[in-house]
Amino acid sequence: MTSLAGAVPRMMRPCPGQNYPRTGFPLEVSTPLGQGRVNQLGGVFINGRPLPNHIRHKIVEMAHHGIRPCVISRQLRVSHGCVSKILCRYQETGSIRPGAIGGSKPKVTTPEVEKKIEEFKRDNPGMFSWEIRDKLLKDGVCDRNTVPSVSSISRILRSKFGKGDEEDMELDRKEQEESEKRAKHSIDGILRERAPASPESEEGSDIDSEPDLPLKRKQRRSRTTFTAEQLEELERAFERTHYPDIYTREELAQRAKLTEARVQVWFSNRRARWRKQAGANQLMAFNHLIPGAFPPTAMPALPTYQLSETSYQPTSIPQAVSDPSNTVHRPQPLPPSSVHQSLPSNPDSSSAYCLPSSRHGFSSYTDSFVPPSGPSNPMNPAIGNGLSPQVMGLLTNHGGVPHQPQTDYALSPLTGGLEPPTAVSASCSQRLEHMKSLDSLSTSQSYCPPTYSTSGYSMEPMTGYQYPQYGQSAFHYLKPDIA
């Protein structure tokens, strides 16, 4: 692997000896010790067998030199959990042998060591077990091979204070017997029974398995406080790339006067914050598309439909229907009885829409507008009752009830208001007497919902539609003060 000219990389991932295919399951490979598998880092492991001794030594040596466990995991191609477990075990017991935490290598505590432990605890009652263990090593009372584990020291402290000598002796004897039983069934004991140890492994098991390397105990690090200049530098780099490589991180660390580890952690936290913000923005955009997703208080006020002063001429209606871009689409109205019962009245409404109720369908429907009449028009299109503003805007207080006169209205997408027209259509006045004969019909016959096709509520041409005759039934329902 070649590097850039003039740059000396700190950490280079070794190139694998062979390119393994990236599959969902680990690839099986043949090793001298048996059938192995390849982990996600490219390292070979044998399921059920502990990590080889030389790799355990390498892990402890790298940790002794201050290399982080995540870097050790990538360089040695060992899983992060395995590295952390070996280092934690070595810190607690001083051993890198497999199964040392479970008591597979029992260390019988001598009376002299127990007396020292009691003395340390008596002099300093707040001393922890791991501090007592470190003091035993520091004072030379024990070495790495004979020092008791942290759990053994804790058991000694629990048993020595408040119990008699006979109970102590019996407890020690029971612990020793249990330790011997556990040793036979430990991983190390089972592997020794299965495979005869070679002379090299026997030598290395007692000498090489215990590297006398002190590890720094992990201290809780205080949170890093970034200055404004450092944050500006980091944000500029984050705008360029969310995943900087090792060279970019080191260069950025030099410019911002930070360590490469701090830069790496900052980018990790910044990516998490960016993903959270992106998800929240997507959710907000999606909820704006669905008005019912949030209560009305969380949604902006929807603009109400307004009416213009200019009315459509009867001759222009067939052209508007034939031209899809100019077609006025009306949603299908609801029956008067159910709507009237479900909607509250609002006498202070200044503008409203009327749904002309024709006994002959849309053949007698008129495009006209209704002037405001105070308390007589209680419907407000802005009432949030579960219906869309378009449907509510087309409903009246007495929708469909006879003997309610109304004037012509025009529906236009242009901004305007509800004002009385200057003149009434001549066709309405000509057919007024003709419509008076229909007063005897019932209210249920007055509701005639229109038919719409499935493609965007476009009106279907029917035989009953006579566009030049629009306005023949409007004047019958006009109020006396308007007529």
UniProtKB/Swiss-Prot annotation:
Species of the source = Xenopus laevis
Q: Which named protein is this?
A: Paired box protein Pax-3-B
Residue ranges under compositional bias (Basic and acidic residues)? 171-195
Q: Which GO terms describe its biological process?
A: fibroblast growth factor receptor signaling pathway; hatching gland development; nervous system development; neural crest cell fate commitment; neural crest formation; positive regulation of DNA-templated transcription; regulation of transcription by RNA polymerase II; Wnt signaling pathway
The residue ranges flagged as biased composition, category Acidic residues, are 200-211
Using the UniProt record, give the first listed, main subcellular location. nucleus
The residues that make up the annotated DNA-binding region are 34-160, 219-278
Can you list the GO cellular component terms from the UniProt entry? nucleus
Q: In which tissues does this protein get expressed?
A: Expressed in the dorsolateral ectoderm during early and mid-gastrula stages. At late-gastrula and neurula stages, expressed in the lateral neural plate, becoming progressively refined to the neural folds during convergence and extension. Expression is also restricted in the A/P axis, extending into the midbrain but excluded from the forebrain.
The UniProt function text for this chain reads:
Probable transcription factor. Promotes both hatching gland and neural crest cell fates, two of the cell populations that arise from the neural plate border. Acts downstream of msx1 to induce the neural crest, cooperating with zic1 and mediating signals from both the wnt and fgf8 signaling pathways. Induction of hatching gland cell fate is independent of zic1.
Superkingdom of origin organism:
Eukaryota
Q: Please verify whether the record's keywords include 4Fe-4S.
A: no
Residue ranges, annotated region (PAI subdomain): 37-93
